[in-house]
Amino acid sequence: MFVLAHLSDPHLAPLPRPRIAELASKRLSGYLNWLRKRRAIHRSDVLATIVRDLAQARANHIAVTGDLVNIALPAEFENARRWLEALGPPADVSLVPGNHDAYVAAADAARERLWAPYMAGDATSPPPRLREERAFQQPEDFEPQARGQGPSPGAQESTPTSPRKRGEVLGPSMAKGEFDSQRAEEEAAAFPYLRIRGPVALIGVSTAVPTPPFMATGRLGGPQIARMAALLAGTAAQFRVVLIHHPPHVVPRSRLERLVDAAAFREAVAAAGAELVIHGHDHLRSLAWIDGPRGHVPMIGVPSASAAFSTDHDAAGYNIYRIAGHPGNWTCEVVRRGLGADGAVTECERFAV
């Protein structure tokens, strides 16, 4: 049996105190939102509790589906790197970025420099990437380096997602310097990556692109979708797990938060097949299904890993996937664990997909 752990959207706290010059962009609205609301939701102590509980699962591998940071300050990427190292070495942790990890175009360089080993394909089966995987030692503990402010990052409402029709993207034009289409295409060209771990093929895709203020849409792009389809087709003998940040099956409460080319993603999976798609972004426990070439493919979301307990949103949690079987006869048991009102992490649900 192969055990895969999945957490997402840790929105690491505390948020470093930004310099004035760093707020001359979309970061300003994000920082105000943090001060107003999100710092009361995302808490470092909650995240530490979740990670300690996850360690007891003795997973073979850990998948993290994005949004490690909040407003993409340079210091946030340093903190996130240290948190990743505490979670596990690059060979044991697979990461895909989220929209907060691409909050502004200037974040690309820091994300690539500091997180690349966790987003790199196997050296023996390299995807179309320009980076090499490097090994790092895991520190004993993680303490965020904050230049100022303290508490937490954000979650959202607790209604399970359900499939809806995809619409067109309509939004304000980008401020100068906020979006560089060539740079976005170069970033997308580094994905997908492929990692083979036992019977499992982990395929990581990126939906992270800079967007205007008050937008949180994601985009894969046609070339990345085509490369993903090729990797899916080439790993049909494995249990194929696609890691993605934005849920590719719904419009999540707002058209300004969705994956704009979700339909193209679903078409690729319908043609090439996959055994499981896992995502974050909505901060919700969710399960939906899309068509595959031989039956339905489960798409499973998790809440923010740092969300404090509340009746207003899904509290922090993570999933365990227990994978067994062989091609044509795979089994996957899902175990959902989450934070309770008493601050303890317990099993919430168990089911097969």
Where are these regions (language model features)?
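Active-site neighborhood of phospho(di)ester-bond hydrolases with catalytic His/Asp-centered motifs
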Residues: H6-S8, H61-G66, V93-N99, S206, ...
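Conserved beta-sheet core of the metallophosphoesterase superfamily
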Residues: S254-P327
